[in-house]
Each structure stands twice: as structure tokens, then as C-alpha cells.
Curated annotation (Swiss-Prot):
Protein name: Ribosome maturation factor RimM
Subcellular location: Cytoplasm
Biological classification of the source: Bacteria, Pseudomonadati, Pseudomonadota, Gammaproteobacteria, Lysobacterales
GO terms for MF: ribosome binding
The keyword Protein transport is assigned to this record: no
Domain PRC barrel residues, every copy: 97-170
Length: 170
């Protein structure tokens, strides 16, 4: 990975599982077990130390994901890793399908209405379960359902622009 390459935060270590060095993970991928598909991982401890890991294996275990890191075989080592963040290089993710987007790619894009009224820039997104919502910050904060083509008319990465059919007063 190039030092300047964009990193994507996929999850974090939330605890130890058992006594053999297995770890409990929190994953923000969809589905959550997809975190194991994207490697190598760049792990960053709460103190800022970073290392690169390949060959991480894992499984679903009830409410948790359980991971096995190469060369970690004891609980004490795992407990010291609590809060460690898990990243991958953006290039490790496969291209999205047509009309699907990685949230991280949308963050920072400018948003304007079909009438050309500038609303601001994408701050972040969140899921409601039924659809995703894009949070746009400009003169004020707006939450717009990320629903194609009903509200989101186009996403143009070259123009750094999302066009929406949205009342600017709402």
C-alpha cells in the first residue's frame, strides 16, 4: 500500500474470545462478515502504533465476529489490542455494482438540487434499515434519503457532485 493511499475504516477489536488468542470484532461492513474478504488489514492501536496483517481468518459467533490473527495465540496479547481499529486500503475493495456506492466515496461530494441550488457537501451517511440517508452540511444540515432515482438523480465523481430532487427548505 502506498503511504498516501486512502484508508477505509472497517471495524475495531472489542475484546478477547476464549483463551487461545481469538478476538471479538465489531465490523461496519455489509454483511458484517465481509470484513474478512478485504485484506491486508492495517491495524492501528489506540496509542497510534500501526502494523499490517494478512491471513486473518474469522467466523460469525452469535452476536460477535470472531477473528484469528496469525501468530497471536494468547489472551493477554488480545486484551492489549482492545480498541484497535481495522483499516484496508481503498484499492482492496472491489468496484461497486452499477448504482451502488461506497459511502466513503460519497463523503465530501458537493450536493445541489435539480434546479442548481447548492445545498452543501456530504458529511456522512447512515442507514435506517429501509434506506441509507446522506447528511449534507452547508448553510444548515439536511438529511436526504439516498434513494435512486427518486431523490438522488445522479452521482458524478468527476464533477464531485450529487444532484438531488429535494426541496432546499426541507
Amino acid at each position: 500500500m502506498k503511504p498516501t493511499e486512502r484508508r477505509i475504516l472497517l471495524g475495531r477489536i472489542v475484546g478477547a474470545f476464549g483463551v487461545k488468542g481469538e478476538l471479538k470484532l465489531e465490523s461496519w461492513t455489509e454483511p458484517r462478515s465481509a470484513i474478512f474478504r478485504y485484506q491486508p488489514w492495517i491495524v492501528r492501536t489506540p496509542s497510534g502504533q500501526e502494523s499490517v496483517l494478512s491471513g486473518v481468518r474469522g467466523r460469525d459467533q452469535g452476536k460477535n465476529l470472531i477473528a484469528v490473527f496469525p501468530d497471536i495465540t494468547d489472551r493477554d496479547t488480545v486484551e492489549a489490542m482492545h480498541g484497535t481499529e481495522i483499516y484496508v486500503a481503498r484499492s482492496a475493495l472491489p468496484p461497486p455494482k452499477p448504482d451502488e456506492y461506497y459511502w466513503v466515496d460519497l463523503e465530501g461530494l458537493q450536493v445541489e438540487t435539480v434546479e442548481g441550488i447548492k445545498l452543501g457537501a456530504v458529511s456522512h451517511l447512515f442507514s435506517t434499515g429501509s434506506n441509507d440517508v446522506v447528511v449534507v452540511r452547508g448553510d444548515r444540515e439536511r438529511m436526504i434519503p439516498f434513494v435512486l432515482p427518486e431523490y438522488v438523480k445522479s452521482v458524478d465523481f468527476e464533477a464531485n457532485l450529487i444532484v438531488v430532487d429535494w426541496d432546499p427548505d426541507f
